[in-house]
Swiss-Prot record:
It comes from Actinobacillus pleuropneumoniae serotype 5b (strain L20). It is found in: Cytoplasm. Zn(2+) binds at C292, C297, H299, C305. HAMAP family: GTPase_RsgA. One of its GO terms (biological process) is ribosomal small subunit biogenesis. GTP binds at N156, K157, I158, D159, G210, Q211, S212, G213, V214, G215, K216, S217, S218. The lineage of its organism: Bacteria, Pseudomonadati, Pseudomonadota, Gammaproteobacteria, Pasteurellales. Pfam families: RsgA_GTPase (PF03193). Binds 1 zinc ion per subunit. This is Small ribosomal subunit biogenesis GTPase RsgA.
């Protein structure tokens, strides 16, 4: 783990914490009870605490300084170990190093919620049952493009398909391959193509996203059998599984790389984004955006719409274009019904 420099504000915060008396010593640390400042990575985030891994691979449960907000899995942090445990807590996180990126989603109660930080790729996990939803894949891809994090589309439970059904699925995935996205069909149950997933995951730090029931926990069980992540039963009625992961956590993979597992998300909303951001989330639109006749073109029936003309010429996939408008409409409907605030 390479050393990283703290900002001046973070250095002042640490120095201030060193000289500040703690009001409740029975609940928090006094300065003389703490060791030297060291660097670590957050591997698990709990409601009031976080587990920090040291450069030596040791993990300590830590309190958070009151001045810190929104510590998440993947954060590189400055922390201090206590001379002894205090009510089961081993140290204190003092500061968060600047993030290279973060994955966020809107929350109906908390505004914009950061899920994880410092991610090298997002693994979008989908499944053939109850149905393969390209609209949901497109929704996640907009998030990936907005966060500027590379994406890999993984289709799980491929063993449940016949040969003809597999060919049809490959045609659907070709829509994404033709615009530069990588895709992978596999089965966590049979192990088909799991070695290919291993190679993708060895690239760096990855995070699984996808609706409940697509088999994220089953994939983790295959990748890390000793973890034995809980596997939720898929509802016979809805086909959607129950949430089985209760805390976000970072795992080190034996073949190299890290994997962040976060609670399943049934709806990854886009209502925190502006329509222009969703438009920019469609990478194949980029070559024609700005060439429409009207600057405020909505890319519907507007005269001289370059995006629609590209669809009619077959240069932009019609299904993706239809999903784009569905996402915009869904965003507008939800936006009018919900109020949210961004975290300061």
């Amino acid at each position: 783990m390479s050393k990283r420099r703290l900002t001046q504000n973070q250095q002042r915060r640490i120095k201030s914490n060193h000289h500040k008396k703690i009001a409740k010593p029975e609940l928090e640390w006094q300065d003389e009870m703490l060791g030297e400042v060291q660097q670590g990575i957050v591997v698990t985030r709990h409601a009031k605490h976080a587990d920090v891994e040291t450069e030596q691979g040791e993990i300590y449960r830590c309190n958070l300084r009151r001045t810190l907000k929104n510590v998440v899995v993947g954060d590189q942090v400055s922390w201090r170990k206590g001379n002894e445990q205090l009510q089961g807590i081993s140290g204190v996180i003092e500061a968060i190093y600047p993030r290279k990126n973060e994955l966020s989603r809107p929350d109906y109660y908390d505004g914009i919620k950061v899920m994880a930080a410092n991610i090298d790729q997002i693994i979008i996990v989908s499944a053939v049952l109850p149905t393969l939803s390209l609209n949901i894949i497109d929704r996640y891809l907009v998030i990936c493009e907005t966060a500027k994090i590379p994406a890999l589309i993984v289709l799980n439970k491929i063993d449940l398909l016949s040969e003809s059904e597999r060919q049809e699925v490959q045609k659907q995935l070709a829509i994404y391959e033709n615009i530069g996205y990588e895709t992978l069909c596999l089965s966590a149950d049979t192990g088909e193509n799991m070695e290919k997933l291993d190679r993708y995951l060895s690239r760096g730090t990855s995070i699984f996203v996808g609706q409940s029931g697509v088999g994220k926990s089953s994939l983790i069980n295959q990748l890390l059998p000793e973890v034995n992540a809980l596997t939720g039963a898929v509802s016979d009625i809805s086909g959607l599984g129950q949430h089985t992961t209760t805390s976000s956590r970072l795992y080190h993979l034996p073949q190299g790389g890290n994997l962040i597992d976060s609670p399943g998300i049934r709806e990854f909303g886009l209502w925190h984004l502006e329509p222009e951001q969703i438009t920019l989330g469609y990478r194949e639109f980029q070559s024609v955006l700005g060439t429409c006749k009207f600057r405020d073109c909505k890319h519907k029936s507007d005269p001289g719409c370059a995006v629609r003309e590209a669809v009619e010429k077959g240069e932009i996939n019609a299904i993706r274009f239809e999903n784009y408008h569905r996402l915009i409409e869904s965003r507008d409907e939800t936006k009018s019904q919900r109020h949210f605030r961004t975290e300061e």
